[in-house]
Amino acid sequence: IAVFGCGGDRDPMKRPIMGEIGVKCADIAIITSDNPRTEDPDAIIEDILKGVKPEYGYYKVVCDRRAAIRYAMDIAEKDDIIVLAGKGHETYQEINGVKYHLDEREEVAAHLEELRN
């Protein structure tokens, strides 16, 4: 299961390519927001989807990155691997010049705790 998006204010020509590769290479692709910066997150996702065809595989759009991570964890089955791509060490989501706290490690740990209870 791959969770990925494309950053805003970066080369928009790469977005369809990333969509194609992301959906082709994952059993399940979850397309989400990744530092939209000054761009509209929905417009970035629309650019990503220009490279995606239904025959490439299953994908779902979940614009909110926290919700996308939780969705991936909710649908994962035994022996599935979830790849959270793009953020790496970053602990924020940059939206319109503001860096909002978003640490994917914290999100995963919190949702794992919820799933256990």
Q: Predicted segments — roles?
A:
Residues 1-117:
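ATP-dependent carboxylate-amine ligase
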